[in-house]
């Protein structure tokens, strides 16, 4: 989606290559482009894991090459109140939240968008791999997958609404990552070969267990298998997620030929977290029934069109980078919905997002609250 005619567009410059090429493309189209660098975390500015200072230097260097102004804006208080506090609450409740989803909804497309409008922007743009399309038949703005299937980020953007989408551009969503890198090198961007960021949104890459340990209380408890046998002790339920295989401290795989099925040599996976009893349940084998679900329930739904989809056939992702899975919307009322899947889904995790699609169009989604066993399929 291109912006026309000439407009004042504020670009969120992160210091990465995607937002840098975003700013360049819009400048090439003749728009008045202003860059804003968002600082959203300052608890440990001097830590070896905090990259915001380096990222700002990179963003400023990019702005200089492109020939645009850049502003440094601090949203640390908003991030802590709206994103990080909820992130901690979810972990303390035994769920596994997705901070990138909340960060997009509350910071990049709320706090940042509001600030951009206050400084005279007509639209904002970010380096997300997604697309926005206006549908003249319905009068609605649609959120579409990015053209590069390996980089599509629509899953993280499913909480955006019509007002936000109408004022947002995703220029690199029309490109593949290889093209973005090529453009960056051709115009001499200093961060053309900078690696993609990972880790917690705006907090960066760091040892997760050590980081989480600073903010939440935790209590060790038993690790039990599906037959109730005690296999060891966990360090706190918050530090584990469903489907986890590494770091359980109960032994490894003795026979690499028995990875998917059960048996005494199969690997162990986290299957359940019994918060009330402080028990971590593990099972052997990737395809153990406790790891498979045919149904799920979700809440706190956001529908991009402003209304829930009709009951019937659909497709969904229950985690990022997952292939779309055929499903049926069995109920969608208010903020709640339920899905059933003809093919069992693996390690459906409370706290993660279930995001619905109609082809390339992202319909919205919600937070998974529960998943049903394989024998509960409709």
UniProtKB/Swiss-Prot annotation:
GO terms for molecular function: ATP binding; tRNA binding; tRNA-uridine 2-sulfurtransferase activity. CDD domains: MnmA_TRMU-like (cd01998). NCBIfam families: PRK00143.1, trmU. One of its GO terms (biological process) is tRNA wobble position uridine thiolation. GO terms for cellular component: cytoplasm. Its EC number is 2.8.1.13. Disulfide bonds join 103-201. Residues 98-100 are annotated as: Interaction with target base in tRNA. This is tRNA-specific 2-thiouridylase MnmA. Belongs to the MnmA/TRMU family. Keywords: ATP-binding, Cytoplasm, Disulfide bond, Nucleotide-binding, RNA-binding, Transferase, tRNA processing, tRNA-binding. ATP binds at residues 12-19, 38, 127. Catalyzes the 2-thiolation of uridine at the wobble position (U34) of tRNA, leading to the formation of s(2)U34. Its main location: cytoplasm. It comes from Paracidovorax citrulli (strain AAC00-1). It is found in: Cytoplasm. InterPro entries: MnmA-like, MnmA-like_C, MnmA-like_central, MnmA-like_central_sf, Rossmann-like_a/b/a_fold. Residues 151-153, 319-320 are annotated as: Interaction with tRNA. It catalyses: S-sulfanyl-L-cysteinyl-[protein] + uridine(34) in tRNA + AH2 + ATP = 2-thiouridine(34) in tRNA + L-cysteinyl-[protein] + A + AMP + diphosphate + H(+). The active site is at 103 (nucleophile), 201 (cysteine persulfide intermediate). The record marks 128, 352 as: Interaction with tRNA.
């Amino acid at each position: 989606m291109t912006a026309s005619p000439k407009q004042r567009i504020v670009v969120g410059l992160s210091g990465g290559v995607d937002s840098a090429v975003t700013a360049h493309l819009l400048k090439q189209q003749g728009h008045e482009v202003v860059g804003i660098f968002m600082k959203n975390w300052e608890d440990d500015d001097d830590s070896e894991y905090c990259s915001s200072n380096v990222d700002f230097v990179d963003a400023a260097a990019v702005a200089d090459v492109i020939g645009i102004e850049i502003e440094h804006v601090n949203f640390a208080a908003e991030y802590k109140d709206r994103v990080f506090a909820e992130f901690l609450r979810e972990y303390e409740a035994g769920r596994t939240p997705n901070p990138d989803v909340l960060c997009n909804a509350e910071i990049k497309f709320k706090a940042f968008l509001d600030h951009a409008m206050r400084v005279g922007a007509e639209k904002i743009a970010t380096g997300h791999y997604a697309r926005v399309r206006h549908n003249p038949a319905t009068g609605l703005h649609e959120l579409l997958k990015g053209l590069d299937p390996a980089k599509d980020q629509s899953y993280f953007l499913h909480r955006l609404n019509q007002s936000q989408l109408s004022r947002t551009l995703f220029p690199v969503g029309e490109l593949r990552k290889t093209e973005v890198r090529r453009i960056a090198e051709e115009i001499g961007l200093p961060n053309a070969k900078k690696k993609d960021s990972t880790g917690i949104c705006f907090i960066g890459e760091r040892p997760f267990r050590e980081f989480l340990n600073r903010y939440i209380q935790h209590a060790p408890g038993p690790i039990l298998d599906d037959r109730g046998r005690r296999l060891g002790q966990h360090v706190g339920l918050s530090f584990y997620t469903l489907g986890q295989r590494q770091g359980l401290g109960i032994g490894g795989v003795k026979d690499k030929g028995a990875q998917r099925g059960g048996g005494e040599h199969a690997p162990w996976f986290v299957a359940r977290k019994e918060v009330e009893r402080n028990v971590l349940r593990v099972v052997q084998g990737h395809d153990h029934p406790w790891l498979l679900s045919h149904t799920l329930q979700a809440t706190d739904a956001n529908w991009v069109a402003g209304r829930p989809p009709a009951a019937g056939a659909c497709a969904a992702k229950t985690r990022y980078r997952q292939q779309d899975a055929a499903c049926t919307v069995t109920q969608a009322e208010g903020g709640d919905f339920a899905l059933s899947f003809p093919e069992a889904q693996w390690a459906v995790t409370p706290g993660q997002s279930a995001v619905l699609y109609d082809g390339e169009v992202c319909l919205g989604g919600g937070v998974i609250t529960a998943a049903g066993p394989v024998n509960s399929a409709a």
